[in-house]
A protein has these predicted regions:
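Structural motif
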Residues: 74-83, 360, 409-419
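Short amphipathic alpha-helical "interface-anchor" segments enriched in bulky aromatics
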Residues: 55, 102, 380-417, 421, ...
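Acidic/histidine-rich, metal-coordinating catalytic segments
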Residues: 181, 254-264
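An anionic, glycine-rich sequence signature occurring as long contiguous blocks
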Residues: 2-6, 11, 15, 19-31, ...
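Dynamic "connector" segments at or just before major functional cores
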Residues: 1-205, 211-250, 272-275
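A short, flexible helix-boundary coil/loop motif
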Residues: 425-437
């Protein structure tokens, strides 16, 4: 203890001497620098926050989000709602993915004042506030307590529904495309809904699944839904997708719903057709689809659809489908030298590269089969299919840079609430960047 006191006094004395000297000139590997102590100055690591806060003030997104929040405290020492949501916003905007990272913001004396806050809360206070917004009913509770928690959860859901709808409302007044996808969120604890299922990044690791509904080319999230790890099939996100479509007016409906092979099944397509909603999905390469490709391959009416692709359309009704549907087959010849990677189990997973030279008498093709409920031309469908890859960049950004891969708690309710909050802040930031440009 004595040595620690001595070290503390030495540090304090050195700092006081440096402050008395005023400006210091230091020689560093990068050149000469001047160091000056400023007792009254404040600093923030979030340099762009002031510009984003101006957008929030003009648009009123943050003010309405705080004003409609169903969080209510009874203790006189409880934090203000603006402090809770402001801390949450700053954490998301800083690129954090754990509640414990909030502690790194507490030394910021500028950011709270910009958002009209009094202070930045601790990570534990933020967790407790979110548990009050999205309560998880314990195993042992009365029916009255369970009903009260369910009512609070319904209020929070409506609150986020309204906030997300306001954040994308202007984008729905022009023709747009709704991209649907599923993101796997690996978990490293004992969380509710953590189940071992499809996980391409961490096979065998429990996970949650984030069903995402994305406004194509606008970099806006229409909604997000976190479910348990085995709910990665499209049928688990279909109810929410239908509610979103039915909640939009006819003028705001998407021109097209687009998805990968997970959505190319009869259940999803039948629901879209019942809503008179156009769609474009990819089909799995099942035996019936392969026979279709074989029948179409020798046709002479293949049409070029740019970027080396050629297309032809047909009608297909697979076993289990309720009706025949329009399909489009795309193909493109693969040119140049190819490399095939093979893992040998006998050599403990060692990789072996096989070099294949494409000759003129050997034609290699890449192909895909699309099913659609639209009357677009083949060239338009080919372009729409290629544009689908652009939304993957947005999903990757949200998961790896905006916190969709984190903010994990033991209950599923707060995980779901956090994912939607990340989507909301992301939408605001996207609008802010667009107005700045």
């Amino acid at each position: 203890m004595g040595e620690w006191d001595f070290e503390q006094k030495a540090v304090v004395k050195a700092v006081e001497q440096a402050r008395e000297q005023g400006e210091l000139r230091l020689s560093t590997p990068g050149g000469r620098f001047q160091v000056r102590w400023d007792e009254g100055g404040s600093a923030t690591a979030l340099g762009q926050l002031a510009f984003f806060a101006e957008f929030l003030e003009v648009s009123g997104l943050f003010e309405r989000w705080v004003g409609a929040c169903p969080l209510a405290y009874t203790s006189p020492n409880a934090p203000a709602v603006v402090d809770v949501l402001g801390t949450w916003l700053l954490s998301i905007l800083d690129g954090q993915w754990r509640y414990a990272h909030v502690t790194g913001l507490r030394g910021d004396a500028v950011a709270p004042g910009i958002l009209g806050m009094k202070k930045i809360l601790s990570d534990e206070s933020l967790r407790r506030a979110l548990s009050a917004l999205a309560p998880n009913p314990p195993r042992r509770c009365t029916e009255a307590e369970r009903a009260q928690r369910a009512a609070q959860l319904a209020k929070s859901t409506d609150w986020m529904d309204t906030a997300l709808a306001e954040s994308v409302d202007e984008a729905l007044n022009t023709p747009w495309i709704l991209d649907c996808d599923t993101t796997v969120k690996p978990l490293y604890g004992h969380q509710a809904g953590a189940e071992v299922s499809y996980n391409p990044q961490k096979p065998g690791r429990p996970s949650h699944v984030v069903h995402t509904y994305w406004i194509s080319t606008m970099r806006l999230v229409l909604d997000a839904e976190v479910q348990h790890g085995k709910a990665h099939a499209a049928k688990h996100g279909l109810p929410r997708l239908c509610r979103l479509l039915m909640g939009l007016s006819s003028d705001q409906r998407p021109a097209l719903v687009r998805g990968d092979i997970a959505f190319g099944n009869d259940g999803v397509m039948t629901e879209m057709e019942s809503l008179a909603q156009g769609y474009l999905f990819t089909l799995r390469q099942t035996s019936g689809v392969k026979r279709l490709i074989e029948r179409q391959w020798s046709r002479r009416d293949w049409q070029p659809v740019s970027q080396g692709f050629a297309a032809v359309e047909a009608t297909l009704q697979l076993a289990g489908w309720s009706r025949a549907r329009r399909v489009v087959v795309l193909r493109r010849r693969v040119r140049g030298d190819l490399i095939a990677e093979v893992k040998d189990d006998a050599l403990k997973g060692q990789q072996t590269l096989l070099f294949a030279e494409a000759k003129d008498d050997l034609k290699l093709w890449e192909h895909t089969v699309l099913v659609t409920h639209t009357d677009h031309t083949l060239e338009a469908i080919g372009q729409l299919y290629r544009d689908r890859a652009d939304c993957e960049n947005g999903f990757d950004e949200l998961k790896n840079q905006w916190g969709w891969g984190g903010y994990t708690t033991q209950d599923l309710e707060r995980c779901h609430l956090s994912a939607r909050a990340v989507a909301l802040i992301y939408n605001g930031w996207s609008w802010s960047c667009r107005t700045a440009q």
